Amino acid sequence: MSTKSKDQHARVSYLYQASQLLFRNVQEPTLSRHYISTAKDVSQKSVMRIHPDIKRTICKGCNSLLVPGKSCSIRFEEPSRKNPSIDRVLWICKKCAFKKRFSDKSC
């Protein structure tokens, strides 16, 4: 990993952690969304992938942090007829109503 990519990775990580802190402790969702948006821009410009665990906590519609009970609601969907062994979890953003579906194993 080059020095430039390490710097970009550290910047994205810092912005994500700062947005979490602002959202949970200071109750500043607007600034938190701005930091998430900036982190996504930095990762796209440097062609760097964001870890899937971090992606799962960000709304694609409005860049809000998805915190169960505060900014999103979680529902468990019925198993499909094609794959009855896979349970699905539905995360719904309370700000923009964007829906994210995950298999239960990935959450």
Swiss-Prot record:
Its cofactor is Zn(2+). Keywords: Cytoplasm, Hydrolase, Metal-binding, Nucleus, tRNA processing, Zinc. Zn(2+) binds at C59, C62, C93, C96. Its main location: cytoplasm. Binds 1 zinc ion per subunit. Its EC number is 3.1.26.5. Gene3D superfamilies: 6.20.50.20. It is an enzyme of class 3 (hydrolase). It is found in: Cytoplasm; Nucleus. GO terms for molecular function: metal ion binding; ribonuclease P activity. GO terms for biological process: tRNA processing. Pfam families: Rpr2. It catalyses: Endonucleolytic cleavage of RNA, removing 5'-extranucleotides from tRNA precursor. It comes from the Eukaryota. One of its GO terms (cellular component) is nucleolar ribonuclease P complex. Component of ribonuclease P, a protein complex that generates mature tRNA molecules by cleaving their 5'-ends. Belongs to the eukaryotic/archaeal RNase P protein component 4 family. This is Ribonuclease P protein subunit rpr2. It comes from Schizosaccharomyces pombe (strain 972 / ATCC 24843). The lineage of its organism: Eukaryota, Fungi, Dikarya, Ascomycota, Taphrinomycotina. The gene is rpr2.
